[in-house]
């Protein structure tokens, strides 16, 4: 392409973008990380793939599993790799809806909250908030003892698992079952929930962000 042709093409792009900014955008398919099944999450627009990097998406676990009991669970993912029109995410966090948490607390019960920092065996550092609801009111000594139990369970389980195994236990309710068993040795429990997870530090391989541009060869191969 000659310099004159390049200039004309550039001017056409400017004209189009002024008339309709969406004309230069492409739609990218966003997927969950492989350790969460690599399922399709959403389609998002961007004028160039670099602008997708580190963008955060929030979806309900219900959108992935179609299990109604998962409606209160919000998952956060962050795009860190783009390959053509495919964007790959990494897990960023989890949180229960406020309405659901409020529904757990009833008159005559106690709420025991614990915040624990854990590290998986493959190097993910996360802060986890746990919520336990007792069947009746308990004292501060019992609350402290229960927090200690929950701390021990969470740190031990995380250290024994990689991120995929750990999140599988969280999302399938296996981790809360272990916390329930540990906590009820201190006082009778009605419910235990993982209220929030926030990733504090990724392992080196997850820190990297990459973009593989869509090329003519890529389109032809697809």
Swiss-Prot record:
Coiled coil: none annotated. SMART domains: Ribosomal_S3Ae. GO terms for biological process: translation. The keyword Ribonucleoprotein applies. GO terms for cellular component: ribonucleoprotein complex; ribosome. The keyword Ribosomal protein applies. GO terms for molecular function: structural constituent of ribosome. This is Small ribosomal subunit protein eS1. It comes from Pyrobaculum islandicum (strain DSM 4184 / JCM 9189 / GEO3). The gene is rps3ae.
């Amino acid at each position: 392409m000659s310099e004159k042709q390049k200039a004309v093409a550039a001017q056409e792009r400017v004209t189009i973008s002024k008339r309709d900014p969406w004309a230069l955008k492409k739609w990218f398919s966003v997927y969950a990380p492989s350790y969460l099944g690599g399922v399709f999450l959403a389609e998002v627009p961007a004028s160039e793939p670099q602008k997708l990097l580190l963008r955060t998406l929030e979806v309900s676990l219900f959108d992935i599993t179609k299990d109604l009991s998962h409606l209160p669970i919000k998952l956060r993912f962050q795009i860190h790799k783009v390959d053509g029109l495919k964007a790959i995410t990494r897990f960023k966090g989890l949180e229960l809806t406020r309405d659901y948490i409020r529904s757990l607390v009833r008159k005559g019960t106690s709420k025991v909250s614990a915040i624990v920092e854990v590290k998986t065996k493959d190097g993910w550092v996360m802060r986890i908030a746990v919520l336990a609801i007792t069947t009746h009111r308990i004292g501060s000594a019992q609350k402290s003892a229960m927090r200690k139990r929950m701390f021990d369970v969470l740190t031990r389980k995380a250290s024994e698992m990689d991120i995929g195994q750990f999140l599988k236990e969280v999302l399938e309710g296996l981790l809360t079952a272990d916390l329930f068993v540990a906590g009820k040795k201190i006082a009778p429990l009605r419910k235990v929930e993982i209220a929030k997870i926030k990733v504090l530090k990724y392992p080196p391989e997850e820190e990297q962000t990459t973009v593989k541009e869509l090329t003519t060869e890529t389109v032809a191969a697809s």
